[in-house]
């Protein structure tokens, strides 16, 4: 690999990745973390299949006599679309849930329709007022932090909980795969309800009315009182994203949207323009590193791909400015300003850390995601520490 940077010997995470360390073999701590998760969950092995088979039986038992027995968040992307197919194959009765931040691409919207129609699955949608959604997004942009997708990610989680509560469903299935996508490094892309609300209060102009904000109390309600479990099937079973794409295209005339997270136009702006240009950060190394770890791509090819400019949708910047009512000068001024960290705004982070023992128990019981426990419930390393 042609670089003077220190790079993990197993993936392509380099010394610029937040809070990275390397062991005596040159393997980064994130590879070791994923190694531990694979062993714990039995991912793609008999152990994982047995564990997940028991979960399926528990889902069916808990859903007996109800219209639905599980919730699946859908975006029109590969993972959630394939998850819909799998749940029907497993004999489950899913309710698809979609949070519409009003930035969906036409391809994603059509993908959702095609798959749900073919599989005869009902859809529950929460649409935030587009002016309000744009006001929240614009406020995060003005805050100079990297998490402009935070409001969408948190809202989807809240909406899935609400749908589960409404229909008395005890299980939410999520299409995340740490084998195919990796896990976002510590300190990157943090979000919680207090963070979003505080930034919107500082920079927003409209009241937050239709946006489904997940506060700390609501988070505890969903996990401890409602006891809604979050299951990530791909953490247990074998999953190949490329095979899933081929299957979806063949069976449902599903269309690929051009890249990971590019099914939504605000997400596309975040990944291909905002992070690379303002923060000098490119999250493609998450997926590329996962491909290298899985032997689906060699390190040199992945490194070359990572160092190419990301694909940028034509007229995406102009669309972003028009939607958020930003002048050229205003947009340029924000993009050139010094970036800020989420640590400079109010969050629930200290509270999560204080309650770490509780969240460990909840994570083990699938009542909060294990990735939440690993990323949010430990103190950040001090300055100068890795």
Annotated model-derived regions:
Residues 70-79:
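Short, glycine-rich nucleotide/cofactor-binding loops
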């Amino acid at each position: 690999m042609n670089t003077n940077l220190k790079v993990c010997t197993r993936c392509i995470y380099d010394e610029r990745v937040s809070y990275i360390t390397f062991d005596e073999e040159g393997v980064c701590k994130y590879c070791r973390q994923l190694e531990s998760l694979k062993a714990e969950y039995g991912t793609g092995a008999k152990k994982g299949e047995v564990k997940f088979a028991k979960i399926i039986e528990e889902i069916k038992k808990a859903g007996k006599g109800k219209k639905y027995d599980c919730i699946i968040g859908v975006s029109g992307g590969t993972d959630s679309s394939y998850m819909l197919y799998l749940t029907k194959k497993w004999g489950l009765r899913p309710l698809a849930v979609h949070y519409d931040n009003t930035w969906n691409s036409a391809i994603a919207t059509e993908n959702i329709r095609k798959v749900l129609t073919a599989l005869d699955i009902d859809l529950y949608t929460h649409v935030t007022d587009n002016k309000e959604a744009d006001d929240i997004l614009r406020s995060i942009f003005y805050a100079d932090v990297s998490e402009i997708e935070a409001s969408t990610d948190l809202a989807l989680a809240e909406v899935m909980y609400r749908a589960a509560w409404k229909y008395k469903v005890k299980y939410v299935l999520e299409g995340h795969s740490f084998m195919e996508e990796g896990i976002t490094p510590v300190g990157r892309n943090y979000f919680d309800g207090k963070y979003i609300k505080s930034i919107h209060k500082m920079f927003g102009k409209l009241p937050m009315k239709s946006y489904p904000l997940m506060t700390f109390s609501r988070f505890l309600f969903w996990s401890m009182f409602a006891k809604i479990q979050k299951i990530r099937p791909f953490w247990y079973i074998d999953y190949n994203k490329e095979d899933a794409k081929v299957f979806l295209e063949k069976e449902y005339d599903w269309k690929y949207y051009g890249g990971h997270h590019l099914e939504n136009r605000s997400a596309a702006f975040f990944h291909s323009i905002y992070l690379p240009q303002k923060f000098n950060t490119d999250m493609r190394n998450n997926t590329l590193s996962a491909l290298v770890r899985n032997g689906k791509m060699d390190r040199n090819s992945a490194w070359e791909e990572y160092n190419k400019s990301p694909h940028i949708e034509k007229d995406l910047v102009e669309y972003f400015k028009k939607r958020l009512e930003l002048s050229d000068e205003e947009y340029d001024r924000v993009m050139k300003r010094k970036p800020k960290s989420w640590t400079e705004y109010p969050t629930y982070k200290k509270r999560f850390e204080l309650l770490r023992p509780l969240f460990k128990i909840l994570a083990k019981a699938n009542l909060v995601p294990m990735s939440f426990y690993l990323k949010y419930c430990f103190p950040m390393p001090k300055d100068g520490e890795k």
